[in-house]
Every structure is written in C-alpha cells, then in structure tokens.
UniProtKB/Swiss-Prot annotation:
Designated gene of the protein: EIX3
EC number of this enzyme: 3.2.1.8
Stretch forming the signal peptide: 1-19
Catalyses which reaction(s): Endohydrolysis of (1->4)-beta-D-xylosidic linkages in xylans
Gene3D superfamilies recorded: 2.60.120.180
Pathway: Glycan degradation; xylan degradation
Organism: Verticillium dahliae (strain VdLs.17 / ATCC MYA-4575 / FGSC 10137)
One Pfam match: Glyco_hydro_11
High-level lineage: Eukaryota, Fungi, Dikarya, Ascomycota, Pezizomycotina
Name the record gives this protein: Ethylene-inducing xylanase 3
Active-site residues (renumbered): E122 (nucleophile), E213 (proton donor)
GO molecular function, one term: endo-1,4-beta-xylanase activity
GO biological process: xylan catabolic process
Family label: Belongs to the glycosyl hydrolase 11 (cellulase G) family.
Length: 294
C-alpha cells in the first residue's frame, strides 16, 4: 500500500460538454491528493492512494491531519515518526467511516529474519474500524491487555502486494482492540513484546504513523497525534543462521486439534509452550532455544 516510486501525472483537460462514465472516473482520480511522504511541522507523514477514490488528505498544525474519501479505491495516511519505536503514543480526534476502514497505529519493519531473503512486515494496532473486522480470516496468535482493554493478536500473509520495498510477499501483524475507541494512549512496547513472544519477529523499524485507512468505502477523519517517548528498540536477539549441514526438521505432532505456526513463526525450543507444527514450511531447530517454521 505504500509504493512511492512515482507520482500521479495530471490528465489532459476534458473536451466537450457531455462527459462519458470513463471521464467521470478519471475526473475523480484527478481530484485526489497525490501520494507523498515527508515531514510537516515536526512530524513525519505518509499518504498513499491507488487513485481509485476521490480522496483528500491535509496536513494540519503539529501532529494533526484530516482525510476524507469516497467512491471506492484503497488509501491510507497519517502522521507520526520515522523510524518507528517502542514509544508511547497519544491521539485524539474524530473518525467517521462508512464501510471498510481502520484507525490504527500503522507501521513497517524490514528484515525480521536477517539471514533470509530480505522481507518486510506491515503492522497494525487497530483502535477503531468500520463494518469489517480486519482480523477476519487471519490466524489467531493470542491476546494482550493494554490501557484497560483486550487486544487480540493475529497474523496474516499478503502475496504480491504493494509494500515499502515495492511489490512483495510479506507478513501482517495485527492487534485489534475489542472495544472501539477514537482517542487514548498506545504504548507500542506492549504490542512489540506481545508479538515477539508469539514468534512474530519485527526487525528494523521504518515509519510509524497513526493512520486512517479506507478500502472501497467512504468516510472522514480528523486525528491529532502526540507522544514520542521511548526509543527505537534494538531488534530482538536472533539465533545465528544455521550452518551446513542444516539441522534435521523437527517432526510435527500428529494432526488433530490446535493451530500451527505460520511460516517464519516459532515452533519449538527449550521452554516453548506454543504451537509445534507449521501451517507452511517445516519446523527446523536453529539452536536448543529456538525452532522456526522455514
């Protein structure tokens, strides 16, 4: 959702008095705020749209921004920091979705497994959403309590989709708040630690914003972001890459009840009480403390 290798080019003027349906579609695209990233009034901002919606994004003073959209398409934008970190974030504002939309702390990381092909991770701490629960169809990874509410953890895979490194296949990490809200405090260390404990490794942080996302829907939001305490965490210590020959795969338990770890997830090791089978790949011991689905 965030490939910024090119900007949209304005179309030529519409000729004639009577516009065709195709003309209307192109006009809607021209009326959208072009995708961009940068710094505004002390905050990093990121705005991306696929051009399919009539969408307007505006940077306001400080950490505040507004966005409105309609007529379909995919878009996401907000203000925050680059790089992301385990900071405590406060935010407030208004959020009025009509259809599929999220309000979330949203960010990206790179290289969660340094010895493998470079990968990216897209993460969401979802505070509010429209008609579609983003955890639908994702794999449950546990739960964590934060700021008086339960957040449910999930993991999903995106295949050949836009990312900070172009089109890629990558993991999505989710923490979805049971009771929706538009305003409060989010301590990102809580969620980074919970994901890591569930075998969902993060890597090196890229940007982190409090974002509004819309997908073939309509709505508006005006959000004010503050915070910044904490520091960019060092990536969790990772086991050394396996030497040749690789250790033999760990035999998964017989099929039955329970769920298996996703690819790249933890599946064993001394003291590990989670899943010991893999929904994709095979469980391979990296050392006595850590086995992983590869």
């Amino acid at each position: 959702m965030v490939c910024f290798s090119s900007l949209f080019v304005a179309a030529s003027a519409i000729a004639g008095v009577f516009a065709s349906p195709v003309d209307h579609e192109q006009l809607a695209k021209r009326q959208s705020t072009p995708s961009s990233q940068g710094t505004h009034d002390g905050y990093f901002y990121s705005w991306w749209t696929d051009g399919g919606a009539a969408a307007t994004y505006t940077n306001l003073a400080g950490g505040e921004y507004s966005v409105s959209w309609s007529n379909g398409g995919n878009l996401v934008g907000g203000k925050g920091w680059n790089p992301g970190s385990a900071r405590t974030i406060t935010y407030s504002g208004t959020y009025n979705p009509n259809g599929n939309s999220y309000l979330a702390v949203y960010g990206w990381t790179r290289n969660p497994q340094p010895w493998l092909t470079p990968l990216v991770v897209e993460y969401y701490v979802v505070e509010n959403f429209g008609t579609y629960n983003p955890s639908s169809g994702a794999t449950a990874r546990g739960q964590v309590t934060h700021d008086g509410a339960l957040y449910r953890l999930f993991e999903s895979t995106r295949t050949n989709q836009p990312s900070i490194d172009g089109t890629a296949t990558f993991q999505q990490y989710w923490a979805v708040r049971d009771v929706k809200r538009t305003g409060g405090t989010v301590n990102m260390a809580t969620f980074f630690n919970a994901w890591t404990a569930a075998g969902m490794r993060l890597g090196t942080h890229n940007y982190q914003v409090v974002a509004t996302e819309g997908y073939f829907s309509s709505g508006s939001a005006r959000i004010n972001v503050a915070g910044g305490g904490g520091s960019t965490p060092s990536p969790p210590s990772t086991p050394s890459p396996p030497t040749t020959p690789s250790p033999p795969p760990v035999t998964p338990p017989p099929s039955g009840g329970g769920s298996c770890a996703a690819r790249w997830g933890q599946c064993g090791g001394s003291g590990w009480n989670g899943a010991t089978c893999c929904s994709a790949g095979t469980c391979q011991a990296q050392n006595q403390w850590y086995s992983q689905c590869l």
